[in-house]
Curated annotation (Swiss-Prot):
It is a single-pass membrane protein. It comes from Bacillus licheniformis. Keywords: Membrane, Transmembrane, Transmembrane helix. InterPro entries: Holin. It comes from the Bacteria. Belongs to the SPP1 holin family. The chain crosses the membrane at residues 44-64. One of its GO terms (cellular component) is membrane. The gene is xpaF2. It is found in: Membrane. This is Uncharacterized 9.7 kDa protein in cwlL 5'region. Pfam families: Holin_SPP1.
Amino acid sequence: MKNLDKGTVIRTVLLFVALVNQTLIMFGKSRLPISEDQVNTLADALYLAGSTIFTIVTTLVAWFKNNYVTSKGKLQKETLKQKGLTK
């Protein structure tokens, strides 16, 4: 147990809690007071947050990759202009 990192211990404990909860639900006894509406609300919020983060990151990466914003990029643009390969 001394060789396990904190993340492994946390994931193992959460897995155990989830398995116990699922077993109790199978026998008709819910131990975690979580309603289906709460789960749906959380899922919707996580989806919205994930979509927003994905859109922002993708937009920034595409903008950075498609524009000459670094000094190296500006040199590349000048080289392309000199060789007639860009507008």
